Amino acid sequence: METLLAILAGMILMSSLVKVGLLPMKVRLVVAVCYAAFMGWVTSHMTELSHEVFVQLATDRSIMLDLAVCVILEAVVMMTYCFCSPKQKVWGVLLEYEPVLLAIPALCYFQAQLLYGLPGVDYAWVAWMSAGLVLFLMLGGPLLLRWLLRERHLLLELLFIINLLIVVLCVAITGYS
């Protein structure tokens, strides 16, 4: 189960990376700074919880079902954006600036894994190093994707495929738990 959750969180972050790559540079900068600041801020709250709390949350079936519903709804919104964006109808414009909200819990998941995986390391150092890494990846990753996939419709197809895999993974997680 832990492996499936890690893969799901990674896919959600990849989806947010592709989605941020479709935004204008100013918006990308704001999103990257917000994600990085969140990574630095959330560490003090996460250190108050023990690792067993995270394990209990991951093994509780009702929480996993609620999480699956939220993830599937977010993926459907992203897939709707993929269909509406090329036509630039009202929905495409509205969904363009809709942030990937599930990137925040995915970042929390990886921050918790990092904090509990590095015992004896200063939490503040881990927090701000991970914030710097998130800032670098959220600014550099979309530029790399735009350079590799040059055309907007290829980025939209990649976003659609990633979100389709997220939906399949959510179905697998709910069936597994």
Summary of predicted features, one role per range:
Residues 124-129, 141-177:
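C-terminal transmembrane helix-loop-helix hairpin of multi-pass membrane proteins
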Residues 3-22:
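N-terminal signal-anchor/start-transfer transmembrane helix
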Residues 46-60, 114-124, 174-177:
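Membrane-interface helix termini and inter-helical loops of multi-pass transporters
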Residues 18-31, 83-94, 145-155:
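Membrane-interface helix-boundary motifs at transmembrane edges
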Residues 77-140:
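Membrane-proximal helix-loop-helix units in multi-pass membrane proteins
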Residues 28-51, 105:
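A generic, lipid-embedded transmembrane alpha helix
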Residues 49-84:
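Alpha-helical transmembrane-segment detector that highlights a single hydrophobic TM helix
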Residues 42-47, 106-114, 165-177:
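Hydrophobic alpha-helical transmembrane segments in multi-pass integral membrane proteins
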